[in-house]
């Protein structure tokens, strides 16, 4: 599987012919080898995307015709859903059930943007100048560099690829170097669907070379990145030299607020799902639980009891509820944060260690972990752990919980639980976050925008605005009765 770079319509190996082994985090077995690209491969891919865009074969197609091809991609994803889901679970360790749901969502994203591709015919605006016409049009931005994370490899790729293509752009995609397999497969499907040569390019490789080139190269008009906050800051600095458009989604430290009048049985169940789904490796994970003090002890006891019963295991086994962490390095990071939490004075209620089950010893597993007695001064409350670690805080009033919920550098998502809907709406209105759920956690869909406030990033994916991110706005003015101005009498 060495020819895993797709540049200018051809599957090729990297120039330096370096190979990376892709492993299954459940058992550390090699599942594939891929060609590891470098800066020179990124430059080649950017040049191909630039030529394709400037040639205009894709951007000059009608929105209807582009939409047909994007819709074909959706249909091919549905055709190969089982294969894609199996690849995703092998690559990430997540359960097969989750991967199948992801693939269905991915197909829906492509279908949604296929439908939007021909919907923006511009806008005629009223001109204050006599004998003139004025219209606003949106045009494709050009060459788009796209960098995706390892936790939802193909889902995050779809949020970038589908709107970029629907809007008429060309792309250079860099998936995470450790989870590229489903992205490779979908580029084959895009080729099958009829995406023209040079329009969609794929370069595997590290962020330090391939990612950096996408940021600094003057022929890239936009860079979209989903990942960690420190890497996002590096991309901002690198891209500032040529003032390209940037879109960043940098994670969150998301509050899950439970008032005493909530449906506690449902709220406990959803709190578990909020933080332990996909072993907590979710940018929107509800890793900060804020519980009204009157119900704290009861809520915590039930939560801990349920967390201890979560079934870790092989994602291909039906009884498995959560898989491993992605790598040994990432597990070590999670373990370090647990040590920090204990040192800071948080009370470890459950977890905080690797499981003892002999069947799990070859994988990167970590037990669901809950800390109580937490406060906003703690690093485990402020920093994104990105693992199965929950911090629990208490509050006694609306004002207090709003202050606590907003007291991080992040602002991606949050949730409010109460039977008093007016109270939920009041709190939601004051949360500085891009998404707020009321009596639910985690739902997203193609029609609604996704993105964050503060250092969770800027720009939006999904929804109509997700398409607009990949466009430039142009004002076209026409004088219907041209005449001399006679400003200069000479």
Curated annotation (Swiss-Prot):
Record-listed E.C. numbers: 1.2.1.8
Species, as recorded: Bacillus subtilis (strain 168)
UniProt record similarity statement: Belongs to the aldehyde dehydrogenase family.
Induction of its expression: By choline and by high osmolarity in the presence of choline. Repressed by GbsR.
Keyword Disulfide bond attached: no
Top enzyme class: oxidoreductase
Gene this protein is translated from: gbsA
UniProt note on regulation of activity: Activity is stimulated by low concentrations of salts and by moderate concentrations of glycine betaine. Highly tolerant to high ionic conditions. In vitro, activity is highly stimulated in the presence of proline.
Name of the protein: Betaine aldehyde dehydrogenase
Superkingdom field: Bacteria
């Amino acid at each position: 599987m060495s020819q895993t770079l797709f540049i200018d319509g051809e599957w090729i190996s990297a120039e330096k012919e370096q190979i990376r082994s892709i492993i299954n985090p459940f058992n550390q077995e090699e599942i594939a080898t891929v060609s590891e690209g470098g800066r020179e491969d990124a430059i080649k891919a950017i040049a191909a995307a630039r030529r394709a865009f400037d040639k205009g074969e894709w951007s000059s197609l009608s929105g209807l015709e582009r939409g047909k091809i994007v819709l074909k991609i959706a249909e091919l994803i549905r055709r190969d859903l089982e294969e894609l889901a199996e690849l995703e679970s092998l690559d990430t360790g997540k359960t097969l059930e989750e991967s199948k749901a992801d693939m269905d969502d991915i197909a829906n994203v492509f279908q949604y943007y296929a439908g939007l591709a021909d919907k923006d015919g511009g806008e005629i605006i009223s001109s204050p100048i006599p004998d003139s016409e004025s219209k606003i049009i949106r045009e494709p931005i050009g060459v788009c560099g796209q960098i995706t994370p390892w936790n939802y490899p193909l889902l995050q790729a779809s949020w970038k690829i589908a709107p970029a293509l629907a809007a008429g752009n060309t792309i250079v995609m860099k998936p995470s170097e450790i989870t590229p397999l489903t992205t490779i497969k979908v580029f084959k499907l895009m080729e099958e669907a009829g995406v023209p040569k040079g329009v969609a390019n794929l370069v595997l490789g590290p962020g330090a070379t391939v990612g950096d080139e996408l940021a600094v190269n003057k022929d890239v008009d936009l860079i979209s990145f989903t990942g960690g906050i420190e890497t996002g800051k590096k991309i901002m600095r690198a891209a500032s030299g040529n003032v390209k458009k940037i879109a960043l989604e940098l994670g969150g430290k998301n509050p899950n607020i439970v008032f005493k009048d909530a449906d506690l049985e449902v709220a406990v169940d959803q709190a578990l799902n909020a933080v332990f789904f996909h072993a907590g490796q979710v940018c929107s994970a509800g890793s900060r639980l804020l519980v009204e003090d009157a119900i704290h002890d009861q809520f915590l006891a039930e939560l801990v009891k349920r967390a201890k019963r979560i079934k870790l295991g092989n994602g291909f086994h039906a009884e498995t509820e959560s898989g491993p962490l992605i790598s040994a390095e990432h597990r070590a990071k999670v373990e370090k944060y647990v040590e920090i939490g204990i040192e800071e004075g948080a009370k470890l209620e459950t977890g905080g260690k690797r499981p003892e089950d002999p069947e799990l010893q070859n994988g990167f597993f970590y037990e669901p972990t809950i800390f109580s007695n937490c406060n906003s001064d703690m690093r485990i409350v402020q920093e994104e752990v990105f693992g199965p670690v929950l911090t629990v805080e208490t509050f006694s009033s609306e004002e207090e919980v709003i202050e606590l919920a907003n007291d991080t550098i992040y602002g991606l998502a949050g949730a409010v639980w109460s039977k008093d809907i007016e109270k939920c709406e009041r709190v939601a209105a004051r949360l500085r976050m891009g998404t707020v759920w009321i009596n639910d956690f985690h739902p997203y869909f193609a029609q609604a925008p996704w993105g964050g406030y503060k250092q969770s990033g800027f720009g939006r994916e999904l929804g109509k605005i997700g398409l607009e991110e990949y466009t430039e706005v142009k004002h076209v003015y026409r004088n219907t009765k041209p005449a001399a101005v006679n400003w200069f009498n000479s």
